[in-house]
Amino acid sequence: MSEKHLFTSESVSEGHPDKVADQISDAILDAILAQDPHAHVACETVVYTGTVNVFGEISTSAYVDIAHVVRETIKKIGYTDSENGFDYKSVGVHVSLVEQSSDIAQGVNEAEEVRDKNGQLVDPLDLIGAGDQGMMFGFATNETAEYMPLAISLSHKLVKKLADLRKSGEISYLRPDAKSQVTVEYDNNGKAKRVDTVVISTQHAAAATNEEIHDDVINKVIKAIIPAELLDDETKYFINPTGRFVIGGPQGDSGLTGRKIIVDTYGGYAPHGGGAFSGKDATKVDRSASYAARYVAKNIVAAGLADKAQIQLSYAIGVATPTSINVETFGTGKVSDDELLAAIRKVFDLRPAGIIQMLDLLRPIYGQTASYGHFGRTDIELPWEQTDKANELKAMLEK
């Protein structure tokens, strides 16, 4: 008997310690951008029992009450009771923020392309150099309506459903910390066939019984989210498999900004360049170029030019023009990858300033991305999720 073709992805809830840290970092970023759209921000957060540490480098004219932003973010997530060992009222907030390095700033504020012109007129979109070197990936597939791999899409929706049920009071014993994991079986043609395994661990009140947790999660979460045709008698369910999950959140484990980069992106289905997103303004190509790469990939697939598309971008610090652009369609392209690459260069400006202008990234829009994924979101409007370039790409390649 042949082996099944299985692929697994996971997600975590907004109350997971690492996601608490991400949301704090992005809430601070948004608060600064609301006053100073051109601020340079690299804000990191550590959370643990009773304590939040905020540190990093920020250059801005804005004044933000960091401690207030931290407490409001924790409150919004749902850590409102001291019995959780971490709540917005009593948490200690320690802030250590300094100005961005002048060595980095000189390359971001004036790209190499500008410095090499010796005072001559230059393209305004050459003004901003990449905030660091590195490579970034974007991916899209027609496997789901949101152009995301099925396993990560379902994983996000499961933990989001848990949060919705908790916040509405429908399941009153739920607490903020939770994780999900979904294993999808594929057929020999690479098409998603069924859900093989679902794992959900959710923090709960001490009074909740294992039986009621199991029944509620199966009936009100899993069956409400995963289409019935993907579940069968062979699907395996693991609900709080350790037995109990009362101690959770930052009381149970420390959290750090940028430690859930696979959850943030494609659930391991596509490569990751290694750079985290949260707490970084758009001059940091770790973030903005990853968004641009997703935008390119999604428009390719939405145009019907490929069933799957993967884009790699790379940059040198202080240089505006990407050092490389790579396209891979895994044999599903309706035109060659070389033709796609030529069209991408004409349709998308992938210099940092070009990306910022194209996606309007100087706005305080980042806090909403810090939980439940940066891509494939249908509950919020994100500029890199638009498919407004699909027709232009298609028309160019049909000539």
Curated annotation (Swiss-Prot):
Annotated binding of ATP, by residue: H16, D177, A178, K179, R244, F245, D253, R259, K260, A276, K280
Q: What does this protein do?
A: Catalyzes the formation of S-adenosylmethionine (AdoMet) from methionine and ATP. The overall synthetic reaction is composed of two sequential steps, AdoMet formation and the subsequent tripolyphosphate hydrolysis which occurs prior to release of AdoMet from the enzyme.
Q: What is this protein called?
A: S-adenosylmethionine synthase
Which metal ions or organic cofactors does this protein require, according to UniProt?
Answer: Mg(2+); K(+)
Annotated localization: Cytoplasm
Positions with a binding annotation for L-methionine: E57, Q100, D253, K284
Record organism: Lactococcus lactis subsp. cremoris (strain SK11)
Q: Name one GO molecular function term.
A: methionine adenosyltransferase activity
Q: Which reaction does it catalyse?
A: L-methionine + ATP + H2O = S-adenosyl-L-methionine + phosphate + diphosphate
Q: What is its EC number?
A: 2.5.1.6
Which gene codes for it? metK
